[in-house]
Every structure is written in structure tokens, then in C-alpha cells.
Amino acid sequence: MFTTTPDPHDIDEGALEVHAPKTAAAGVKAVAVALERGMAQAGVARTVRGMLRINQRDGFDCPGCAWPESITGKRKPAEFCENGAKAIAEESTVRTVTPEFWAAHPIAELEGRSEFWLGSRGRITEPVVVRPGETHYSPISWGEAFELIGEHLRATTPERCVFYTSGRTANETAFLYQLFARSLGTNNLPDCSNMCHESSGFALNPTIGVGKGTVSLEDIHRSELVLVVGQNPGTNHPRMLSALVECRKNGGKVVAVNPLPEAGLMAFKDPQALGGIAGGGEKVADEFLQIKVGGDLALFQALGHLLLAREEREPGSVVDRHFVEAQTAGFAEYREARRALDWAETERATGLSRAQMETVAEMMVASKATIVCWALGLTQQRHSVDTLKEIVNLLLVQGNFGRPGAGACPVRGHSNVQGDRTMGIWEKPTEAFIAALEAEFGIPFPREHGYESVETQHALEAGEVDVFVSMGGNFLSAASDTEHTRAGLKRTGLTVHVSTKPNLSHVAHGRTSLILPTLGRTDVDDKHAGGRQFVTIEDSMSVVHRSQGRLRPVSEHLLAEPVIVARMAEAALGEDHPVDWRAMAEDYDLIRDHIARVIPGFEDYNRRVRTRDGFVLPSPPRDTRTFATDIGKARFTVSPLEYLTPPAGHLILQTLRSHDQYNTTIYGLDDRYRGISKARKVVLANPEDLAALGFADRELVDVISVFNGDERRAEAFRLVGYPTARGCAAAYYPEANVLVHKDLVARESNTPGYKALTVRFERRQ
């Protein structure tokens, strides 16, 4: 039970409790937990004010996931989920981290704390600094902090500076931030999308001409078939469950594909409906395929084989011939590649039976409007890009683009991670984008590609980064190969963290380090000559809308993110720089005016975003059934079969979230749906696998990963028998990120292979 004062004790891993997994998500318990966390963190009045404004048209966008709100119908009074409420509680908390906290806790002590303990201390109230040789952070004025940043940036060269971005950064901040980095002379703009959905962009851009999804929320409601693959919506996007249930009520079918039988894939107890309060909830998945980790490519190739075999037997029954002939290229090669299939190998790769795959293929044949949704279970494998291209193949075969209820749906994890990329947070900017920036601001910008996240890790470790700036986020805990990343960050001359709460990146600091406290989504932003400001967000379905904080900040010393970026830029580039940084920081309309002239789709930005529901960005595949690829058509592709085969004595491990966390932010210690509580250093593995390997349930082990002859070790994890797919295991991140070698990445996208670890266990002595 939380109290209004944070618990002084850290996690006791020996207190682990294990209960039977749940078979339904949400319900009354979710409401109770949401209210409990909010009131304990922020008090009754502040919690109620916040919850009434979450995801409402006159409120603020939830800082959690990127799931959209309806733009066609009435919104529910509670337009948020349990984990959204936890995110708001974390941000609107009245707990504070004051100078007294930093004075009482040396950095060496904080380095040994967990993310849960650090985050639960509260909101940082004023800027702090640690200088070479010092053991504690101590207060610094804003003016001195910006002067220090300017000195370090001017003392080095642009290619030795890195500007990292978290996915919850709003559009206005993101645009200003990339403009700052490029004005300085670098495209070193890694962001969290490099570590999650980068594979989606690398698969979608060359095949359909856009790196985003092609469906709306209403499309899911009216789809005839939705495949939910490599995704746990009950924890990561709980409001998606309402959409899936609505789809089924309208006659659609849902297929879930996942290595773990997650509660949210089975049933949903809608707490705003009578059935969710008194009954067993609504069924979510009509079919559940418990696939092996990494077996999805084999599954989609098998489905392609089955669809084309049906078309060959019954011409016209499957393939949208007019669409394929007029709007695509490469179909003949794809058809030939899928003509033959080794069923024994396919069953071995997937862990599924042929009959299961044939059932799903029949559902696809019967559907005239199919959507495939996916998340990180598909994007963080060595062969992720090929897997996602195979999904595109399946959608193209039946013409499932540009029609109601059909399309591709990569479900983004973090609110505005998609918007950040749209705003130019990308290490590989297009010539068109750079040319538009130059035309707008009248100064030259660099063309040479910069570092993405994994390349940043390599540069840090090589001592090639002098200044590392983090706009939100927690790079140390989000990145792979934790110990190597920690060592790399400590080699920098200056680390700068724009943050709301303490995290472990703050204590893996450069020789000099600054923590700059900022306003959050919930906070009123009104310290401007131009009056109260709002920001804008792009959700997972390309809807751009406004977000305006409504709660009083916990400290008068906090600055808004655009103000922080502008003042860093002035300190580094001088007040006589051609870009009027200060004016944009005072009036965000000016930032949006620049965006409107630089980025296609944002014309008349300030007017359109002030309308009732904002506006939807253009998507040629969705809007006009056209594809802006280099050949002007959608592209079928052919990929070889690939899957994960662990050596004897090993399992394939994936990292995942608990139900009580969001990315690297740990809300609590209750993974309620999986029945794991009070501890986090656990490995979930099939009981039959544990027995075959000679281990017992609850045994304490070290976990060793193997990649290219290198080993990584995670110490003192508890084995828990769990109904995972055979040959597979799972552990929470960030604790398990230490096992992910930085060179274990997806081909093309360079996304870390968090879902592709070959591991073995060693008993603790």
C-alpha cells in the first residue's frame, strides 16, 4: 500500500510472491488501483482534477501510451486506463526532491538504488549540478546552468555532441530541439524510437511509402478481422481492449499471437460497463496462437502460402487482382517464393500446429477488411524488418489498404514518439526536410547522418562524445548492454538531463552533470509574455491535437521544455543567432508557424489544431490507396525463413514490462495479471523446460546470455514456472537489459534485440 511519503526502503527481492495468472484484464480492481495510486501520490483534490482532464478535448494528453481518442464520437468521462492513471499520479505527485535530498544522498549510494526507489522520491524542484571530484549533486541557478552548457558546447565540435529525445516530448519542443542540434552542426539525434518501432519504419517505408500506420480507431471498430501480434494491450495499451471488444460486437474477429497468454488477450472487464463490474468480462481473442519467440516470420510465410494455395484452387477467392496489378510490384516473385512450404520446419519454428495456422488462414480468406496490429514483440528481433515486410505482403495480397476496416497498425508505445519523428528527431534527415529548414531559417544545416541510439552507445564507449543531452527519458536504463552504456556515459565531459524525477541515468553521469527540472504534461505552463501556452501531440494513428496542463507545478523553479531548449541554444550559439529562440519560447504559436511552413501536412497548423479534435495527417495508402515509394507502387518482398534455435541447455528470453511500469518508469511492484508481486528480478519459464534443464521453481540463479562468443550476466534472478511457450522465457526490463549485447540488433533498423536473447541459467552458490 502506498503512503503519501515514499517508503525509505528499496525492493526486497526475497519478498517475491507468486499467484495464479489472471484470465481477464481491467475491471473494478483496475479502478481501485488507479484511485489508490493517485490519492496517495497527489491527494484527493489534485487527483480528481487531473483525472477529469486526461485525454479530454480541453485537457492534457496522457503522458503514457500513444493510443488515440475518438475524433468522431463522444468521449467517455474516464478516457484513460489504469496505467494512464498511474502515469498521471507519478507526474502530479506532491512528493518533491529538494536540495536537501541531494545533500543527504551521495551519488555512490544512489547508483545502487533501483529505478523504482528513485522514481518514487518525487518531482525534482530546482536545477542541480555535480562537478569533477564532487560526490553529491548541489543546487545551481538556471543562468549558471545554461552558461555551463554553452561553455561545454562551444569548447568541442558538433560531431562530439549528442542530443537524445524521449518519446513523450511534445511537437513544439521536438521541433525546437532538432533545430538547436542542427544549428549547432550535428544530426546526432538518437531517440527512443530507435529502440522500439524503428523496425516498423524500415519495413513500411520501402513497401508502402510511409513509415506509419494506415488505420484509424474507427477502422478497428469496423474491421472484419484484427490480428494482434507481439503485443500485450492489457498492460501497454489498455484502451485498445475497448476497441477490440467493439470490433467483435460489430461482427469482427480477433486473433492474438503471443508467447505468453496475457490476460488482456483473453478477456476485458470494462469498468465503465455493467458487464465489466458484475460479470466475467468480454472475450477478446477468438483464436490465441501461443507462438515461440521469433517464430512470427515463419507464421506469416505459412499464412501467405495458404492464402495463395486457396487462390490457385479457387481463382478470385483471395487475391484482389485489380489492386495487385495496378498498385503493386513484385507479386509474381512473392507468389513463387510462397509456393512451397516445409510444414515440419514451420511447426518447429512457430511451436504451432498446421491446423492452427490453417484456421487463421481461413479467417483471413473470409475477411474483406483485415488489420494487423503489432508492437515490440515483432520489432526487437534480428529478423524484425523481414517479419514486418511479410505482414505487408499479406495485407497487399487481399488489398487491405485504403478501405474501411483494413490496414497496417504498428501500435506505438510512448505518447508522441511518432510526433517526434515527424518533427525531425531523426539522425537520417531527408534532403527535402533539410532544404525546407534552410529555406525557412536562412542558414545551412548538416546533411551527414548522425548517431542513432546504438551508434551512440558505441561512440560513448569509445570516448567520442563530449556532451550528452537528454530531453526527458532515461537512456541508461532504456538502452541495451547496461554496464557498457554506464561506462560510456561516465566518459563524457558533460551530461545534461531535462527531467521531472530522478532516474539511474542521473547517477551514470559525465565528469560534469546537470539535472534540469521541467514541467510535465499535467502542469500549467503560463510563465510567458505570450500568456498560457499549450503543446501538441501526434498519436499512433496520426491525429494531431492539443494538450494543455491544468495543475499547478510543485515548484516555482521549473521551466517548460521549449524554454530550456531555447536558453541552451542562446547560450551555445549567442543571442545574435539568426533564429529567434527567445521569441519562440515565449509564444509557441511561432514554433507552430515555422512547422507549418517546413513539414508537409501541417499547413494552417495553429488554426487547425485549435479545432475540436485537431486534424489527421495525410496517409496516401489510407486516403487514396496510393504508395509514395521510389517506384510509385506498393512493393511485395521476398525474405528467407529465419527463426531462433537455442543450443542445448538454453532458452530464448524476451524482456518485457510488468503491469506496474511504463517503459523505464516503475510505478509499483504488482504485476497483477501475471501473478508476480513484491519483486522484479524473476525469470518466467515453462515448468517443463525448467524440469528438463534440471532446475526447480523459485530457484535462485544467474542468467547468462551468449552472443558472438561474448557473455553477459544478470545475477540473482528467481526462476518462476509460468505457462510460456516451450523453449521461451521472459524477464522484466530494465533489470534484464544487462543481458542484451549492444551488437545484438535487428538488421537494417539496428534496433536492439530485446526479444532475442539466448540464455542459460547457473545456480547461485
Describe the role of every protein-language-model region.
Residues 71-72:
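Short, non-ligating residues that shape and space the ligands of small metal-coordination modules
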Residues 583-672:
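Long, low-complexity segments enriched in small/aliphatic residues
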Residues 113, 117-131, 654-682:
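Glycine-rich loop/turn
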Residues 2-30, 122-415, 423, 438-622, ...:
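Cofactor-pocket helix-loop regions in the catalytic cores of large enzyme subunits
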Residues 748-765:
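Long, low-complexity intrinsically disordered regions
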Residues 723-736:
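Short, solvent-exposed secondary-structure boundary/capping segments
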Residues 1-65:
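Intrinsically disordered, low-structural-confidence terminal and linker regions
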Residues 88-136, 146:
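Low-complexity, highly charged intrinsically disordered N-terminal segments
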